[in-house]
Amino acid sequence: MTDKGPKPLGYSELFEGKRVALFAVPGAFTPTCSQQHLPGFVNKAEELTDKGIDTVACMSVNDVFVMDAWGKSQNANEKVLMLADGNGEFTAALGLQLDASGFGMGSRSQRFSLVINDGQVEILNVEDGGEFRVSSCEFMIDQL
């Protein structure tokens, strides 16, 4: 999101020549995502930078306006780049879709974290079921 509204961000613009810590959540404003996952990365963004991360990004299969509002509500926008995978295309390309139809949420992203170094996946952590452990910022920091 820019001051002038939504702006698409391409893969190369986000990942080429950079080391990016990206984490994905099933839904903005959901309990675990809002109380633990996003705040963990917001609070420790500087530690990630100190370990060689150029960009910290949060992604969800939500629209850009929801992601922008969620980032503002969590004081994340200065530390974490909030990314909307509105149609779930990036999530599908990774093969990390989650069928949350039973909760009325449709197709979403599994909870995961990854480090992409110059366009190549360096670290990938995917949670089992409804867990929140290996995709946390603390777990990633220990891996770096």
Each language-model region and where it sits:
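Chalcogenol-based redox active-site neighborhoods
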Residues: 1-144
